[in-house]
Amino acid sequence: MILVRNIRLPLSAGEPQAFEKALHAARIPRGKVQHLGVAKLSVDARHGQPKLVYTVAVTLKEPAEEAAFAARCGDASLQQKVDFSVQNGIQPLAHRPVVCGLGPAGLFAALLLARQGYQPIVLERGPALDERVKAVEHFSATGELDVNANIQFGEGGAGTFSDGKLTTRIGDELCGFVTEVFLQHGAPEEIAWKQKPHVGTDLLRGVITSIRKEIEALGGEVHFNTALTGFEQKNGQLTGIFTTNGTFACEALVFAVGHSARDTCGMLMDGGLQLECKPFSVGFRAEHLQSEIEKSLYHEAAGHPALPRGEYQLSQHVGERCVYTFCMCPGGQVVASASEEGRVVTNGMSFHARNGKNANAAVVVSVGGKDFADDPRRAIAFQRELEARAYAAGRSAGEYAAPAENIQSFLEGRGQLNIGRVQPTYDRGVAAADLGALLPQELAETLRAGLRAYERKIAGYTAPEAILTGLETRTSSPVRLKREENFECTQLAGLYPCGEGAGYAGGIMSAAVDGLRVARAIISRYAPAEG
């Protein structure tokens, strides 16, 4: 297959024009073509006149001719499909492998193990997705929190209640395998070619359930409402685990508990395993009118049907720290994401259509080990303290209401909330608060400097009607459980730290890829348990 890149067209053009321009650029006669398709589509909104930028995939009737044609065009290259395969190992497993956590990392680790005949046992502290959705909706309506069934815990992990983004910077060939699995299980076809693919929380739920059912159909077992509580080991080798629903003998455990399993991290440290601090970030969730964001990004072309919903990604270095936007949700809403009683956490979510009035994104500042004397317990305690402050600051508006403030007020330290055209979407309600007072002064001032810089990049970002809701604290895990090159824990053989909670991923795609890497390491070493 030949990929012809950088096919730039006006918004009024479509696929036929892209195909013709690609063939002309690569000097490929139409009669030699077997198939034409869109491999990637993005928008270049620079210079005030947005352009569609296509990468066109060309398959010739005679594959042997593709290399010669690809060499004729500087924007063309030959691409060979890389099939992902793994060979089963020979060291016998006495027991079936166990996967702890059914977020993206655990889900894809379990899927690969199941497809290779290992019949994994999967443990998830939260409920199945249908029950989880009911618990989330109940919390949104009443403020009654289930600490094991919420936006953080349950089938699918935290990413289930998000925008369903599949973007990543890791550049791993396994990303293609993840996309293929999503497509096999009902994700929209556009995720294969959009520059910034997303599934949306509404469609993602069905995809996750379908993948889990494939695991079960291949002999895997899924135990919901089952939390990991301890380990059993002998001479530095894992021999079994303790859970809230009994014990499981195992010598291979995929530890993929997610970034909010603080009690599990505490159990590891209490049991003698050493965790290390890793960088994470804290801040707020910013809301603007989606239409205003698109006017700033697309100018006169805003609203054109060929354009996707406008989204942005901003960053600004302020001294030794970085202020950046995270998990931007066009046409989305801010959701109550607490998983511990008496603490408020924000996150963003949007449906596939992204048709809400508001745009939202986390605006956060980086923190790291030096802020906590490289003590992982202090890093976790810092998150908890901020969330407790947010709970107290918002409580006047109801249980798990969130503190909020206009961006201009935050910049000036006034603690005021005037609701105009931008209606806050946080589902438990908001209360006016001085958000700067909830953070250490240095972090608050750094965020202010970052926001002022954003105004120079997106006009109107700090407009008086724009709103901040807080606090955003779960951007990633604050800790890492170290592992060797073979993906085993450095301190306990048979334990395989995996995904975002263990400190090795950030987002759905990278977590899924890490799950595949860990599963591949287990498969390459071991043969399936007999019986």
Residue ranges of model-derived segments:
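Residues forming the flavin
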Residues: M1-P50, V56-F161, K165-H185, E189-G531
